[in-house]
Regions:
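N-terminal-biased segments
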Residues: 1, 33-37, 41-43
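Short beta-strand segments
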Residues: 36-38, 60, 94-98, 174-179
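Short hydrophobic/aromatic-rich motifs at helix boundaries and adjacent loops
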Residues: 35, 52-53, 133
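Structural motif
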Residues: 32-34, 55-57, 91-94
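Gly/Ser/Thr-rich loops at beta-strand to alpha-helix junctions
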Residues: 40-42, 98-103
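Thiamine diphosphate
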Residues: 26-32, 40, 52
Length: 208
């Protein structure tokens, strides 16, 4: 913990080199995308995308799970999505799953989650394996995690305000998958119904 505290103490001095950027952020935000991903500490949206402060509106949940739309039972997840789209006018929504996912792995293996009832109940919102079989190992978990991302994309389409914008061509949904062990970001391609690596492009240099 101490290294984190030390960095926080010095952050003000580090930002002093870019006063205009941070002053501009105080005037408001206009993020390019809503980035929905897992709470896993190994998945860092700004690191994966090279986003600067103010460019991503983030929603992180255990297993990048989204609850079903229910106007009678509002959730923090639904409120975050609604705010990003209806108030901030975000036109792109990314759901990014990842390899070695603990939540999906627990579902695939059929782990006993009695000791963590909140986790157990939250995972009921996830997409189980379509074939209902128990599998294990990184490839099986990766396959299930990719299917899970697509299930969450489908769930987003059931949110009425998102459906309206999708029908009007005002919103795009993106299904991504991040390989922790390689750093590769895959995107789902509907025609082939497969996840493929993003084509290489010049990389924006990281800030000093």
């Amino acid at each position: 913990m101490q290294p984190l505290i030390d960095y926080a103490r010095s952050f003000r001095q580090q930002t002093a080199a870019r006063p205009e950027e941070f002053a501009r952020l105080a005037e408001g935000q206009a993020p390019q995308a809503l980035f929905i991903t897992c709470s896993d500490s190994r998945v860092i949206p700004s690191l994966i995308t090279g986003a600067r402060p103010g460019e991503l509106f983030e929603l992180r949940t255990a297993g990048n799970i989204l609850p079903p739309y229910d106007p009678e039972q509002p959730t923090g997840e639904a409120a975050t999505i609604e705010y990003a789209v209806e108030i901030l006018g975000v036109r792109d929504v990314v759901v990014c799953g990842h390899s070695h996912c603990g939540a999906v792995g627990a579902l695939v293996r059929g782990d006993d989650l009695t000791a963590v009832p909140a986790v157990r109940d939250w995972l009921t919102h996830a997409a189980p394996r379509a074939d209902g079989t128990k599998a294990d190992g990184d490839p099986a978990i990766a396959d299930a995690a990719q299917s899970h991302v697509l299930a969450q994309i489908l769930r987003l389409r059931s949110y009425p305000y998102l459906a309206r914008r999708l029908d009007a061509g005002q919103l795009r949904l993106h299904a991504w998958f991040y390989e922790i062990h390689t750093g590769t970001v895959l995107a789902h391609r509907p025609p082939a119904d497969t996840f493929v690596a993003h084509p290489a492009r010049p990389v924006r240099a990281a800030p000093p």
